[in-house]
């Protein structure tokens, strides 16, 4: 997996951003480019489907898909455009609703599924009290020691 993160998944890591509170997000327009969507209108349709899935799963759409306005230069003038600061879950839903014919969509599905699972495991671990955490770590160390003993 670490080799995959370093190569195939690098495009998703490169556009990931982190807020001051440590939460991660991706700009929708940058994600659209990585997912090979040339037209924003086509990607916006995918975002809308992902928002519906988000709402139907009981999540707060405004928390996972917060809309932001950006100012861009268009020749001599400037104009405001809509973008989104997508949560990891929002990105996961987007790649699940993306064009399945695109290879990068399959990579995105795998990347965001793995990252979402990792975050869920970390969140569950962090909710444990100190004694329970110690037991989990102790069990992990026991398994790794058994693997080392078998390899020796």
Map each language-model feature to its residues.
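Short, basic alpha-helical nucleic acid-contact segments in DNA-binding proteins
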Residues: 50-62
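Positively charged, aromatic-accented nucleic-acid-binding surfaces
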Residues: 1-45, 63-152
């Amino acid at each position: 997996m670490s080799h995959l993160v370093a190569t195939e998944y690098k495009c998703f890591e490169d556009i990931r951003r982190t807020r001051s509170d440590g939460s991660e997000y991706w700009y929708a327009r940058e994600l659209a480019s990585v997912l090979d969507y040339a037209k924003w209108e086509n990607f916006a349709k995918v975002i809308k489907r992902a928002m519906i899935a988000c709402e139907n799963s009981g999540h707060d759409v405004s928390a996972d898909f917060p809309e932001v306005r950006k100012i861009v230069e268009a020749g001599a003038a400037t104009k405001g455009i809509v973008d989104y600061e997508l949560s990891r879950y929002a990105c996961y839903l987007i790649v699940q609703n993306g064009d399945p014919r695109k290879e990068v969509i399959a990579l995105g599905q795998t990347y965001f599924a793995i990252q979402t699972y990792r975050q869920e495991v970390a969140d569950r671990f962090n909710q444990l009290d100190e004694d329970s955490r110690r037991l989990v770590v102790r069990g992990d160390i026991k398994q790794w020691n058994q693997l080392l003993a078998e390899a020796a």
